[in-house]
């Protein structure tokens, strides 16, 4: 029964391909088998739940219930007394839009289009709605499942089952590459192979591509191709903005697009479809097993599937050439073939595309998977080793606080704010490493002092009072970084007034008094001590000379005390500036 139904479905698909110009808009329209139809329905229901409840998820029971109702409704079979989930009309609309945007048709659409051809109805009347329903629902497995339950599980049967799963996985991956090569709008194919082999394009990259495709109303693959072409071929004026989320996936997307370009190049440059098909499968095989252990079951499965499909392509091409030879025996050699202009010679590789379409149609006509839960929710069924199910891949990462910005963008903004806070507000000179931090004047201390009431040197002296007080002398002193001079408060005021009168408008700069080789440093509030000499005019009176003598004595008496605060290399640097 199952073989009969599968053969009937294959004949229906062949009839559809013969009349594709009257039934669809593009020759490269691909078909959804039973498994792909179920996956598309699952994604449609999850999208509908997200719109109504905010969660992109759906239970297996709801999917199977809606699947049964969908088959009966599309085949115009009675749906009375059948349960249906809420918002079924919305789910059906999302499902139809998904297939339309992906340039795909399901098997029920093919059946309905073929039924619409009144001239060839007798050719496919053998397919009835009930037969197609049994084929899509997998009722032919009912007896087999009951007999399998009585058979105990052995290590050999488990090993064979695992090998079968790996074979199905390898077959699905290679067919996804071929499907994308024929139909660039197939989002399901992109979801399967975007990160196989590992290109660093995980769930986040697929989510960014999906959002960009929805915004531009394009397919996921075309959005990725457009982005990479803009970066590679466009100038600065055409480059994507730095805020584009796809910029973080440039390397992986470029690797993926360049690989598909290599397959397109083989498809367009090799006129022989048999050779072209073999090379395409060989390139895909080498890409998948590159860097893998040759003894790995996945690598063995890839090699076996590629060899089997290569042989199948050659058989398809041989059968097509035989049909063409029989149909053109009564045509004169001088007479051109039908539809040769703008069809057969429009682009090189059309024969290869036809062969690949036949191969994809045969895959769509295969019986559905027995285990629906494994097909829809198994993480390892989709991607080898580090897999993610199709439902999880299409689900966007959860955002906190109902933020519309992606998680990556919010993290970048937070990191930028931290960098701004970490910037130093204190500007130091290139010689700041030679001064001790305890001699630096803090900004808070300056804000607490009335600048209009006291001179600059007096403010510096008062700020350093807690650090530079000499109990033996009994008065406040200024502990400079390299001058080692201690002055009386009243004398400091006189000297600072004289220095201020000499500098004039340069009062905002750093001031320094050079007294007999000893320096007095008056610093700005945010600047480290620097060396600017302010010469004091010589006085002829004896009182001034006595003042200088006292200053020199005080400096010599406190020289040892100040040396204790020197750091390594400071004495040499001080001697250099004295010269």
UniProtKB/Swiss-Prot annotation:
It is found in: Cytoplasm; Nucleus. InterPro entries: P-loop_NTPase, PARPBP. Keywords: Cytoplasm, DNA damage, DNA repair, DNA-binding, Nucleus. Residues 480-543 are annotated as: Disordered. Interacts with RAD51 and PCNA. Interacts with PARP1. Interacts with TASOR. GO terms for biological process: DNA repair; negative regulation of double-strand break repair via homologous recombination. Residues 486-496 have a biased composition (Basic and acidic residues). Required to suppress inappropriate homologous recombination, thereby playing a central role DNA repair and in the maintenance of genomic stability. Antagonizes homologous recombination by interfering with the formation of the RAD51-DNA homologous recombination structure. Binds single-strand DNA and poly(A) homopolymers. Positively regulate the poly(ADP-ribosyl)ation activity of PARP1; however such function may be indirect. Although it shares some sequence similarity with SRS2 yeast helicase, does not contain a functional ATPase domain suggesting it has no helicase activity. It comes from the Eukaryota. Restricted to testis. Overexpressed in multiple cancer cells. One of its GO terms (molecular function) is DNA binding. Belongs to the PARI family. This is PCNA-interacting partner. The keyword Ribosomal protein does not apply. One of its GO terms (cellular component) is cytoplasm.
């Amino acid at each position: 029964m199952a073989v009969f139904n599968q053969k009937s479905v294959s004949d229906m698909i062949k009839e559809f391909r013969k009349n594709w110009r009257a039934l669809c808009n593009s020759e490269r329209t691909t078909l959804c088998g039973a498994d792909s139809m179920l996956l598309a329905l699952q994604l449609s229901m999850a999208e509908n739940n997200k719109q109504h409840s905010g969660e992109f998820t759906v239970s297996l029971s709801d999917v199977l219930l809606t699947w049964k109702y969908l088959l009966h409704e599309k085949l115009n079979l009675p749906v009375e007394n059948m349960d249906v989930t809420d918002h079924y009309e919305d789910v059906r609309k999302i499902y139809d839009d998904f297939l339309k945007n992906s340039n795909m048709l399901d098997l029920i659409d093919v059946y309905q289009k073929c039924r619409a051809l009144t001239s060839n109805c007798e050719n496919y009347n053998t397919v009835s709605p009930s037969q197609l329903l049994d084929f899509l629902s997998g009722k032919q497995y009912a007896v087999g499942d009951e007999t399998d339950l009585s058979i105990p599980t052995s290590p050999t049967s488990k090993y064979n089952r695992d090998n079968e799963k790996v074979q199905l996985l390898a077959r699905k991956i290679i067919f996804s590459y071929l499907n994308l090569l024929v139909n660039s709008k197939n989002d399901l194919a992109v979801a399967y192979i975007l990160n196989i082999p590992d290109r660093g394009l995980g769930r986040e990259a697929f989510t960014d591509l999906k959002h960009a495709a929805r915004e531009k109303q394009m397919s996921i693959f075309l959005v990725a191709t457009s982005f990479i072409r803009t970066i590679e071929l466009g100038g600065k004026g055409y480059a994507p903005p730095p805020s584009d989320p796809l910029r973080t996936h440039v390397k992986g997307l470029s690797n993926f697009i360049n690989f598909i370009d290599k397959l397109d190049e083989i498809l367009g440059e090799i006129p022989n479809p048999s050779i072209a098909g073999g090379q395409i499968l060989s390139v895909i095989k080498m890409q998948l097993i590159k860097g893998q252990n040759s003894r790995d079951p996945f690598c063995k499965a890839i090699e076996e599937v590629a060899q089997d499909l290569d042989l199948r392509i050659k058989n398809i091409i041989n059968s097509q050439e035989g049909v063409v030879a029989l149909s053109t025996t009564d045509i004169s050699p001088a007479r051109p073939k039908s539809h040769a202009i703008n069809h057969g010679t429009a682009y090189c590789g059309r024969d290869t595309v036809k062969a690949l379409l036949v191969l994809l149609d045969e895959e769509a006509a295969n019986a559905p998977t027995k285990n629906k839960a494994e097909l829809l929710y198994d993480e390892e069924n989709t991607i080898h080793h580090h897999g993610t199910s199709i439902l999880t891949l299409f689900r966007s990462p959860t955002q906190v606080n109902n933020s519309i910005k992606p998680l990556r963008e919010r993290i970048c903004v937070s990191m930028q704010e931290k960098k701004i806070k970490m910037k130093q507000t204190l500007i130091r000179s290139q010689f700041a490493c030679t001064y001790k931090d305890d001699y630096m004047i803090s900004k808070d201390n300056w804000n607490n002092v009335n600048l209009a009431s006291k001179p600059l040197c007096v403010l510096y002296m008062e700020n350093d009072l807690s650090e530079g007080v000499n109990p033996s002398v009994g008065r406040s002193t200024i502990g400079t970084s390299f001058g080692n001079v201690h002055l009386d408060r009243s004398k400091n005021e006189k000297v600072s007034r004289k220095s201020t009168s000499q500098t004039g408008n340069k009062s905002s700069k750093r001031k320094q008094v050079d007294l007999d080789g000893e320096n007095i440093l008056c610093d700005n509030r945010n600047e480290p001590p620097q060396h600017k000499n302010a010469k004091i005019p010589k006085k002829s009176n004896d009182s001034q000379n006595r003042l200088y003598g006292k200053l020199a004595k005080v400096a010599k008496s406190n020289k040892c005390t100040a040396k204790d605060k020197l750091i390594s290399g400071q004495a040499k640097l001080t001697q250099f500036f004295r010269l």
